[in-house]
Amino acid sequence: MREILHIQGGQCGNQIGSKFWEVVCDEHGIDPTGRYVGTSDLQLERVNVYYNEASCGRFVPRAVLMDLEPGTMDSVRTGPYGQIFRPDNFVFGQSGAGNNWAKGHYTEGAELIDSVLDVVRKEAENCDCLQGFQVCHSLGGGTGSGMGTLLISKIREEYPDRMMLTFSVFPSPKVSDTVVEPYNATLSVHQLVENADECMVLDNEALYDICFRTLKLTTPSFGDLNHLISATMSGVTCCLRFPGQLNSDLRKLAVNLIPFPRLHFFMVGFAPLTSRGSQMYRPLTVPELTQQMWDSKNMMCAADPRHGRYLTASAMFRGKMSTKEVDEQMINVQNKNSSYFVEWIPNNVKSSVCDIPPRGLSMASTFIGNSTSIQEMFRRVSEQFTAMFRRKAFLHWYTGEGMDEMEFTEAESNMNDLVSEYQQYQDATADEEGEYEEEEELEQE
């Protein structure tokens, strides 16, 4: 079957990742010891996308956990589902990356990377037909960003034809953990543009806003934020794990969402988001889901889709519903808001339907959009980067690990190129495209 190998790195990646496994285990009826306690055959039908079945009948996640310090790993191991992972798949160093991308990418991380790759190979050999990899990491720290991108480039070399999907937590605009986030994030984006196929962009601030505004939580914890992320992660892959009327996989997703190879950074959303108390009082309908899903307040990264245009988008519905109604709603959205979609990609919204809803809901939907407005986020990080780099602030931490200033300059210009590419396609109109073609024809004559 089409397996996906899950890799989580750094503190953020491990925390998101372990939350994700709680959700997926719950959906497939697998208890914290790896035994199946579910009620429906559908839970087991494609359980091998994310799990190996051990000889004793236990299910073991296809997960590789890495970090440069033991702390977060220990808390995963002692957490609710800590005993389900294969002990050999915990790979950790002792030194820590200290929020330094260079340590994660060149020094400390480079020493540990071979042992991580060994585990990845072992897991990949266990697969029948490996579809791809999903990596959870943050771009602001040292391990997830530096070592995460190192691992992605190594896997790219070894498995060039497999999909590489990342769930990347970007530094948020107002809430900053460390002062060097803009450096780490820019260096990481430089890598992700080249080596990843699809990046789901998340950011803490947008997640805080959702918890605060929509879920009415007064003091959201990281656990609450990660719960939102895990709902989305589970939604992205539900088509692979459960039967559906309109299935999609990572490759189909990429083909439908990526018009130009470098523009593969997506905003994600999830519906229904209602506060825990009010869930039971609201009926769920396809139009309601659709409306909430396209709402800019629902996006899990700090960019406003109303400031740009959608190149493409994909909606994954879960639950028993009529596909006709789904299609009608999607067409409706496009017709009503046609100015927010580029007109030179007709039918640029794809939908898929999976029959099994998430636990506790009758229907749900996951939204993935490729919008030019995501440049706001890159632009913001880039401005912060330039402000510090112009003064060469904090650079010695990076050059001390053997990095060259040249690399910073390259990463900066790559990110600025990305921003202007998004801008170029945001401004492009169908008539312009037509004019080019005519000119070319004349030249050929």
UniProtKB/Swiss-Prot annotation:
Pfam families: Tubulin (PF00091), Tubulin_C (PF03953). GO terms for cellular component: cytoplasm; microtubule. CDD domains: beta_tubulin. One of its GO terms (biological process) is mitotic cell cycle. Its cofactor is Mg(2+). Coiled coil: none annotated. It comes from the Eukaryota. It is found in: Cytoplasm, Cytoskeleton. Residues 425-445 are annotated as: Disordered. PROSITE patterns: TUBULIN, TUBULIN_B_AUTOREG. Dimer of alpha and beta chains. A typical microtubule is a hollow water-filled tube with an outer diameter of 25 nm and an inner diameter of 15 nM. Alpha-beta heterodimers associate head-to-tail to form protofilaments running lengthwise along the microtubule wall with the beta-tubulin subunit facing the microtubule plus end conferring a structural polarity. Microtubules usually have 13 protofilaments but different protofilament numbers can be found in some organisms and specialized cells. This is Tubulin beta-1 chain. It comes from Triticum aestivum (Wheat). The gene is TUBB1.
